[in-house]
From Swiss-Prot:
Belongs to the heat shock protein 70 family. PROSITE patterns: HSP70_1, HSP70_2, HSP70_3. PANTHER family: HEAT SHOCK PROTEIN 70KDA. CDD domains: ASKHA_NBD_HSP70_DnaK-like. The modification Phosphothreonine is found at T198. Acts as a chaperone. Induction: By stress conditions e.g. heat shock. Residues 606-616 have a biased composition (Low complexity). InterPro entries: ATPase_NBD, Chaperone_DnaK, Heat_shock_70_CS, HSP70_C_sf, HSP70_peptide-bd_sf, Hsp_70_fam. This is Chaperone protein DnaK.
Length: 637
């Protein structure tokens, strides 16, 4: 079996790691960075990912997509999506199935399709390092992701050409990376994961028995729409408001200006983790009829903290719930681990330390721990790591809608996965021949307030008085946290396997089409790279040949010179076209025409080398100094 890589598909940044021996190793990308910006840009005929995409965002804001993870597996009408529509420079549109999609360069795309571009870069990064094709991956998701979001993440992996061996929760992955080589017996850890777009808290117990470690998640909670992007947006709004007060101009109507403000706000936020104040200075940020306008706003750490205090406070509520669900108090927690870039903010660190009554560990890299843990899980699945057992949980309860619009739970939240649960239901009316089973995920008693995962009809029920037919519904929750449902009519013994067709999400046909498009693009990218290489080779050949012709001078016969000039001219024409084979053929033709030239160049080089040797010898002779010696007599010694 080939290597199974671990990928942290983040809102702001992504990271890829692989098990190197018995230790996880983060792999640097082509730009030499250990993390890759989760930014995708569509330009004329090219798709950019990572830093190259980020660099051109100011001049191409409407076609530069970021924080796509906030949309993955979400419906267009979701409150969180509607909030994002107000602040994102790119278009968020409603798909035919009601999902939140994006639009760039006039083309509508699903969130998994866009995220697949980041995964493709992660895959390529790993392949370049390993020197072999990679097909298997463990991809991390926020612990509080629901079924639709997990399924959409798996879809993104499939579109990127990866077989997703396992979906693993981010805090659990961080705990794996942290606890793998820790000695000293059992411990109960709290992983506080505040990333670019999502927040999770997981309480995890690490037990060690005879060298085998068990990582058991006791409880998890979180908020899938709280993260560094929200902190950025608070600062962006403050800067825009200050500018409006001073200049009377609303920058929100100017996408180019807003992109510059966004970048400046991100930079200022990071700086304020290490300094008490910073200046946001943007010359020529916009202009009106009178003159160009410049932004110059001083921001203190105290000001930033006042802008985001409620966001930090919002992250503390799930901590209380998770501890209560695990039936623990803060005194039972032995270690606190901070994961996610936003945890570098001093205020976040202070509030978490205050809550748990202890400082967080400093020996965990918040940007890399999740990918490293995913790589460890990849090693477990590949059979390379044998002394680790991971027991994760489902973050939300699962059930169905029953009479009166009530949600009846079959699987309670924080149940260890994989798991199976069943319950017998019946009909609500006499002689009912079919029932609609509406599958839900969430904690509310009222069905309408929970997440709808889809519904299906079970037909062919034999006519009988209400309450008589017995329909056994089975929920099968796999290790990825994804739900499969089956139903059985107990009277007839006939069983039906049912795949939930959620009202949203991508169909198999849509995914297959996107996979084929990705493959086609891969082929096109490969051809483009080969053509660029051929053109570069042609350029070097033309330049080198002309230089040699000049150096050969009269030593090159006129007939050969004409042949070479004709071949150079033909190669220049071929280089302008898109036919790699034609360029290669003309390069070969020029090499053939230049044989005499090569001989002359070689002779000249040999003559030059010989002349250089003679000069060196002469120079050595010139360095000899004549001196008079006096014989030393023995008695003078």
């Amino acid at each position: 079996m080939g290597k199974i890589i671990g990928i942290d598909l983040g809102t702001t940044n992504s990271c890829v790691a692989v098990l190197d021996g018995d230790k996880p190793r983060v792999i640097e990308n082509a730009e030499g960075e250990r993390t890759t910006a989760s930014v995708i840009a569509y330009t004329d005929g090219e798709t950019l990912v990572g830093q190259p995409a980020k660099r051109q965002a100011v001049t191409n804001p409407t076609n530069t997509l970021f924080a796509i993870k906030r949309l993955i597996g979400r419906r267009f009408e979701d409150e969180e999506v509607q909030r994002d529509i107000e602040i994102m420079p790119y278009k968020i549109v409603k798909a035919d199935n009601g999902d939140a999609w994006v639009e760039a360069k006039g083309q509508k795309m699903a969130a998994p399709q866009v995220s697949a571009e980041v995964l493709k870069k992660m895959k390529k990064t790993a392949e370049d390092f390993l020197g072999e094709e990679v097909t298997g991956a463990v991809i991390t998701v926020p612990a509080y992701f629901n079924d639709a979001q997990r399924q959409a993440t798996k879809d993104a992996g499939r579109i990127a050409g990866l077989e997703v061996k396992r979906i693993i929760n981010e805090p659990t992955a961080a705990a794996l990376a942290y606890g793998l080589d820790k000695k000293g017996g059992d411990r109960t850890i709290a992983v506080y994961d505040l990333g670019g777009g999502t927040f999770d808290i997981s309480i995890i117990e690490i037990d060690e028995v005879e060298g085998e470690k068990t990582f058991e998640v006791l409880a998890t909670n979180g908020d899938t729409h709280l993260g560094g992007e929200d902190f950025d947006n608070r600062l962006i709004n403050y800067l825009v408001d200050e500018f409006k007060k001073e200049q009377g101009i609303d920058l929100k109507t100017d996408p180019l200006a807003m992109q510059r403000v966004k970048e400046a706000a991100e930079k200022a936020k990071i700086e304020l983790s290490f300094t008490s104040q910073t200046d946001v200075n943007l010359p020529y940020v916009t202009a009106d009829a009178t003159a160009p306008k410049h932004m110059n706003v001083k921001v203190t750490r105290a000001k930033l903290e006042s802008l985001v205090e409620d966001l930090v406070q919002r992250s503390l509520e799930p901590l209380k719930v998770a501890l209560a669900d695990a039936d623990l108090s803060v005194n039972d927690i032995t270690d606190v681990i901070l994961v996610g870039g936003q945890t570098r903010m001093p205020m976040v660190q202070a509030k978490v330390a205050e809550f748990f009554g202890k400082e967080a560990r400093r020996d965990v890299n918040p940007d890399e721990a999740v990918a490293m843990g995913a790589a460890v899980q990849g090693g477990v699945l590949a059979g390379d790591v044998k002394d680790v057992l991971l027991l994760d949980v489902t973050p939300l309860s699962l059930g169905i809608e029953t009479m009166g619009g009530v949600m009846t739970k079959l699987v309670e939240k924080n149940t260890t996965i994989p798991t199976k649960a069943n319950q017998v239901f019946s009909t609500a009316e006499d002689n009912q021949s079919a029932v609609t089973i509406h599958v839900l995920q969430g904690e509310r008693k009222q069905a309408m307030y929970n997440k709808s995962l889809g519904q299906f009809n079970l037909e062919g029920i034999q006519p009988a008085p209400r309450g008589m037919p017995q329909i056994e519904v089975t929920f099968d929750l796999d290790a990825d946290g994804i739900l499969h449902v089956s139903a059985k009519d107990k009277q007839t013994g006939k069983e039906q396997k049912i795949t939930i067709q959620a009202s949203g999400g991508l169909s198999d046909d849509e995914i297959e089409k996107m996979v084929q498009e990705a493959e086609a693009n891969k082929e096109a990218d490969k051809k483009f790279e080969e053509l660029a290489t051929a053109r570069n080779q042609a350029d070097q050949m033309i330049h080198g040949t002309r230089k040699q012709v000049e150096e050969a001078g009269d030593a090159l016969p006129a007939e050969d010179k004409e042949k070479i000039e004709a071949a150079v001219s033909e190669l220049e024409d071929a280089r302008k076209g898109d036919d790699k084979e034609a360029i290669d053929a003309k390069v070969q033709a020029l090499m053939t025409a230049s044989q005499k030239l090569m001989e002359i160049a070689q002779q000249q080089a040999q003559a030059q080398a010989a002349q250089g040797g003679d000069e060196a010898a002469q120079s050595k002779d010139d360095d000899v100094v004549d001196a008079e010696f006096e014989e030393v007599k023995d008695d003078k010694k």
